[in-house]
Amino acid sequence: MNFFQRFTFLFSAPVFDADDLEGLRLQQIMAAIEHMGFQVVKARRIEDAEIAVQTDAAIGCMVVDWGKKGLEGKAASLIALMRRRGLEMPIVLLVRRKRFEDIPVEVLDFIDGYIFLAEETPEFIAKNLVSRLKQYAETLKTPFFGALSDFAEEGNQLWTCPGHNGGIFYSRSPIGRIFMEHLGEAVFRDDLDNSVLELGDLLTHEGPALQAQKEAATIFGAEKTYFVLNGTSASNKIVLSALVAEGDLVLFDRNNHKAAHHGALLLGGGTPVYLPTERNSYGLIGPITPASLDEATIRAAIAASPLVKDPEAATRRRPFRVAVIEQCTYDGTIYNAQKLLEKIGPLCDYILFDEAWAGFMKFHPIYAERFAMGLRELGPDAPGIIATQSTHKQLASFSQASQIHVRDRHIKGQRRRVEHRRFNESFLQHASTSPFYPLFASLDVGAQMMKGRSGEVLWDDTIRLGIELRKKLRAVRREFDEKESDPVRRWFFDPFVPDRVSIPDVAREGGTHDVPWESLSTDQLASKATYWEFKPGAAWHGFANLAPGLAITDPNKLTLLTPGLDRTTGQYEAHGIPAPVVAQYLRENRVVPEKNDLNSLLFLLTPGVESSKAGTLVSALVAFKRLHDDNALLDDVMPEFVARRPARYRGVRLRNLCGEMHAFYRSANISELQKAQFRAEHLPEPAMTPYQASRYLVRNDVDYLPIDEIDGRIATTLFVVYPPGIATIVPGERITERAKPMIAYLKAFERAENLFPGFGAEIQGLYREVDASGVIRFHTYVVRE
């Protein structure tokens, strides 16, 4: 099947039968199209055609029967729907000569051609339609994927890497053949060596590879875009390796992903000045504490840092080489980037916005002023702006696909600017000389999918689906509250959005009144960021220190809170349902959340999520509630899990396990520890820079100790609970009384590993060792002193 034959024809007409002349002519046209190797889809009703155009993106040409007055307006509405959704395939009207005058001007604007059944032969009409489809399909060929597809169709015989030679090597082995059939032949044929000159150079950015990145830059609002093939972890390292040299000051959001630590501090050798951040009682990741963004506070932090040796650093006009900001956290806290620019921009040469979790913000107006490439008023005194995005997270790309967007022409000619040639030297340090071409092609295609009206429609649909899903969850919860006679059963999972919001009061000029969030129309909720805002003092979000308009919760992150904490006070309740238990149940029922914390579950919303999947999620959550309330045996609730750990869980009941685990975390006061370890007063004392501490680890000048024995010692690894991948202790920090919440938090996880096997978290920088008595103990490396 060639490139063009991957597209189909849609015929929308009430008559396809060959027992009348019109039906016979249609059959002959469709048969001629099929004879040329194309598939034809038939829709007798306009409603069926509407479903087809919204669900089948392979339609390359549509033929619509105009009928009597446009089938009472239905044909016109179908055509308008297609164009409104940004669908640009050719539309050809099947029309009778006497009804041609019925077609209104607004429809004529959308039409590419006409078929009069009484004229021309079926074979000629079919050729004309195929020609139109090919012209349309040609416009969809993206720079790199188009060239890759053309090369694949040439049938070139390759004597190059990779050794599997288009998959043939795999076909010589039974399991290799199965592997090849599982993935499909095309991915092996497209796995090419960089000696294929027709595709350009992915490292020096030439040919189709360069053109793909140029067009992506235009689509995402950047001046220059780099495609990166080993994740945003690598993108951040590329950017920060290009910007930061040993001793440079880095203004560092304590919410940053571990890759930012690697790039700026462990590889670059930068000296951090940290911005403390908020957590709520559920452990959700909140914004930077507003007071810490004040210039005077930041300059005071520079002056107070024992790592800053330059006595004049705090008074320099631009003390920081770069500020690194987690623009969208894993839990969906998104900043107003314009406000951050106004606050910290004058202090920095560059700002790196890590948008790994929100590469879609360019494509919906609700995110206005919240993404780096949309920043306004960038003059010669502004910092250079860089954004990194994990296109594989919620955009359409293969895993590990990432991109770097740059806007820094406004500082051209200034010494602080890193021009392309120097930046690319850093790119080359972190890029493989054997890139995976299908991965690069996925970045090219993923960008083009967002082009024009199409991207806006896709993300608007997604946000609306998320709103409707949250409304349904609130409705289910309300029903349980109203209908359950037993108070113990009056609960359900609650979406992390406001309980009530303020709207204008039509009865009082300038007045407002509060209404339930879910009572607002989907149009309102999908268009105004104020209904997603973390407003200071609002109980629903639980963040103590906020500034007006600083942050919102992301409509495309569906966070569900589990019972166990009073949402108003943040205090533990008598009984709770830990999220790890819910997540395990869902996985065994083939519903896989993105992540869970102790009291929350995260589900990602993308254009790949459909209503049926949303309905399945609601049903699974209701089923879990029934099993919990009936205190069902774990053997029945999660049999696969119990079968792996029968000694601990066989015969245990679901509600009892939830209560036991909840009581454990309540006794350890985990909720308070999660908040405390990111507060300014608990950020550990820095004894040396992260880079210096990491050298001790490399040279093996370290002691390997259980965490019970590291008081007063200097860390050499990042202590990272994963997810979300945020460091609680950084190399070079001395573990003293200030770090008590971090150590207490990790010790609680250590005890939980032994009490609740199978529900443990991934913790990087610490290592599980089993002592002589069979107890798991966490160990780590500290500087040998």
Residue ranges, per PLM feature:
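A short, charged/proline- and glycine-enriched loop
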Residues: N2-F9, A57, E88, A222-E223, ...
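Conserved acidic segment of CheY-like receiver
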Residues: N2-I33, K42, M62, V92, ...
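Short beta-alpha junction loops
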Residues: V15-D17, L93-F100, E120-T121, A356-P365
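Short acidic, S/G/P-rich loop/turn micro-motifs used as interaction or catalytic elements
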Residues: V15-E22, E47, D65-K74, R97-F100, ...
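Non-catalytic terminal extensions of PLP-dependent enzymes
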Residues: A31, D48, V53-C61, A75, ...
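A generic structural motif
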Residues: I33-A43, G270, V591
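Conserved PLP-enzyme active-site core in the AAT-like
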Residues: A43-I46, I51-T55, D65, A76-A80, ...
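Conserved N-terminal alpha-helix of the aminotransferase class I/II PLP-enzyme fold
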Residues: E185-A234
